[in-house]
Regions:
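Short, solvent-exposed amphipathic alpha-helices that sit
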Residues: 45-62, 140-144, 170-189, 204, ...
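Hydrophobic alpha-helical segments within soluble ligand-binding/sensing domains
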Residues: 29-31, 76, 131-158, 205-206, ...
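Short beta-strand elements in bilobed, periplasmic/extracellular small-molecule ligand-binding domains
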Residues: 57-69, 159-162, 183-202
Length: 324
């Protein structure tokens, strides 16, 4: 009798083991799902995104753990390994480098990944498994170029300075291409009198623009891939007593400082990128993937189910008060 009871108990325990899975993975879905968020590095915009993701996770009954890779690829790989070892249901990943997508996916195993902030190559994305949530970076550049073309509609030749983010970053590439494609499609003669990578940093952009001014070259406008670099250029112009109304300076992100600069007339234009919208959409997309569903019915999703686009918005002196 004791042997029979022990045998039945062992069968029951084995059945529970199979039901729960050896990795300890949670039940998935909205309630009690476990999601790990690995951010490349924290700044004001990314903090807004993470805060919104946490708020949406709380609202949907999802457990969210946030880890900061501090711009270190090895740290981020360890985050992904942790998610795999501890049975997380999904991963949100702002990659330190979009080029590491293959390695990140390999370490995640069968855990779905929602990439954000820096977009991997399309070949690394697949419907229902590995998708990207963000804003179409080329549109930000397009909006900047449209502002410049409207401002200088009476000029046939425009001298342009461009400050770019980190080399190889998807936002750097997309925004810069959007600017150039739109400017060059206008039929005007576009002279790129200075162009370099300032890596999102205002101090770097300031120093570079000071060097540009020493060359004696003339610029009609300065287009920056983010507000931080634009504000660095503003500072350089003020120290050189340059009339900012005669040379519009443009950024992206509509940060608090960027919007304040537009109100003062120091910056001319920026593009609002909704960190809160991206954070919410990333959680919603992750829940879809956990449930084995496509993200196609999320607002902004593409027909192939690989992307969820959160729209950019134009910001200038006429509407900047709406973004404070």
């Amino acid at each position: 009798m004791k042997k029979k009871l022990a045998y039945m108990l062992s069968i029951l325990v084995f059945g529970v083991f199979l039901a729960t899975g050896c990795g300890g993975k949670s039940t998935g879905g909205g309630n009690n799902a476990k999601i790990l968020l690995s951010i490349n590095a924290m700044d004001d915009f990314r903090q807004t995104l993470v805060d919104a993701a946490q708020q949406e996770a709380d609202a949907k009954g999802v457990q969210l753990e946030v880890l900061d890779a501090s711009d270190n690829i090895e740290n981020q790989v360890e985050h992904i390994k942790k998610a795999a070892q501890e049975g997380y249901d999904a991963i949100l990943c702002g990659p330190v480098s979009a080029d590491t997508a293959v390695e990140l996916k390999a370490n995640a195993g069968d855990i779905p990944i929602v990439f954000f902030n820096s977009c991997p190559d399309e070949k690394q994305l697949s419907e229902g498994e590995h998708i990207y949530v963000g804003s179409d970076e080329s549109v930000a550049g397009q909006y900047q170029a449209e502002y410049v073309l409207d401002k200088f509609s009476d000029k046939e030749e425009i001298n342009v300075v461009i400050f770019k983010g980190p080399k190889g970053h998807s936002a750097t590439n997309g925004r810069t291409k959007g600017v150039k494609k739109t400017l060059e499609a206008s039929g005007k003669k576009i002279n790129y009198v200075f162009e370099d990578y300032a890596d999102w940093d205002g101090d770097t952009a300031k120093k570079m623009f000071e060097l540009f001014l020493k060359t004696g070259s003339k610029a009609d406008c300065v287009i920056c891939n983010n507000d931080g670099m634009a504000l660095g250029v503003v500072e350089a112009c003020k120290e050189a007593n340059i009339d900012l109304s005669s040379m519009p300076i443009l950024g992206v992100d509509a940060t608090a400082d960027g919007c304040a600069a537009i109100e003062k007339g120091d910056m001319a234009f920026t593009v609002y990128q909704s960190g809160s919208g991206q954070g919410k959409a990333a959680i919603d997309a992750a829940i879809k993937l956990i449930n084995g569903q496509s993200v196609k019915d999320i607002d902004g999703a593409t027909d192939d189910g690989k992307y969820v686009w959160v729209p950019f918005e134009k910001v200038d002196s006429s509407n900047v008060s709406d973004y404070k």
